[in-house]
Amino acid sequence: MVALLTDTVGSPPVVSEETEQGCAGPHTSYQWDGAVVTAWAGTTAFVVGITTSSLGGIRIETTGGFAVGDDIVAFAAAAPAENVGHPSDSDTFVAFDVASRTSSGDYESPVGSVGYATDGVLQSIVTPGEWSSFLC
């Protein structure tokens, strides 16, 4: 993922090693303007965070077609209640590309991506992600 984003953006990332940071634990961050890859120490787990609508001239969007800067008010209003959170009057978390749940209520696979919006405008997307991606 780091090599792909480096090629797309056309420049290397700023790399930082964190031995401990809140609930994130030890990890390495690879940052470009508008994107970050966070990889956890000792695992193959990583997440990609996007805070721009395009990288290297390529539009970055969810499989549903949403990009940073898009209005998601109608989408959030139509989404199932468990896929939308409102931590404040102006802030909204919304899950995109949600996997189906098993009869026990667990997801068959992780949520595809989550977005954070202020006043209905998408500010960032994290994939794979969950609400805590924005709280740590």
Role assignments for model-derived ranges:
Residues V2-E20, A76-D89:
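Short secondary-structure junctions
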Residues T63-A78:
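Secreted/surface-exposed cysteine- and glycine-rich disulfide frameworks
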